[in-house]
Regions:
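Catalytic cores and adjacent flexible loops of soluble metabolic enzymes
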Residues: 1-187
Length: 187
């Protein structure tokens, strides 16, 4: 609410992921604090590393007395359509069920949703998905070593990739990417 108080004409839109299970509460508090918008996902593609379900938030916010300018009938049609798309994506491997789950350990690993889905994808491409827990545990260590950069693109990908390299090499910093080297040189 301090942002809205200081700059009332500035639109505030909040974006988060459901990875840790806290997104619905985060959005409720953001709306209560005066956020102008929240990013959501239609229910078949919501949850996990995606955003909270549009339909659920629309319902909950209306129940709390907020005006929600969405047509529920259209949302139902959209959800029905995307249920089929989701099923196809799950069947062909485009959508990974791991990334659609809640993982409260991300609170400890300090990994945002988008970064988690990229880590999963990277490990799968290397046939090393069994190393996910080790890579997750290594990530905050790499982040600390690098001086706690914000975990947004591109630094989130750099930290995650280095964590994966450390785990797969069996030794920390045996392999160091050029992006990490440039970051450490201040480039």
């Amino acid at each position: 609410s301090a942002i809205k108080d200081a700059v009332p004409e500035l639109p505030v839109v909040v974006h988060t992921h459901c990875t840790t299970g806290l997104a619905f509460m985060t959005y409720l508090k953001a709306v209560e604090a005066g956020a102008d918008g929240i990013d959501t996902a239609i229910s078949p593609f919501s949850g996990g590393t995606a955003q909270p379900a549009t339909e659920t938030l629309a319902y909950a916010l209306r129940q709390l007395g907020y005006q929600v300018d969405l047509d529920d009938k259209v949302l139902v049609k959209m959800a029905d359509f995307f249920k089929g798309v989701r099923a196809d994506f799950l069947a062909d491997g485009t959508l990974d069920p791991i990334s659609m789950a809640t993982d409260t350990q991300c609170l400890n690993y300090q990994i945002p949703g988008g970064m988690l889905s990229n880590l999963i994808s990277q490990l799968k491409m290397m046939n090393a998905i069994d190393k996910l827990d080790e890579a997750l545990a290594e990530t905050p260590k790499v982040r600390a070593d690098l001086g706690y950069p914000p975990l947004v693109t591109p630094t989130s990908q750099m930290v995650g990739s280095q964590a994966v390299q450390n785990v797969l090499a069996g030794e920390r910093y045996k392999v160091v990417g050029k992006e990490i080297k440039a970051y450490c040189r201040g480039e």
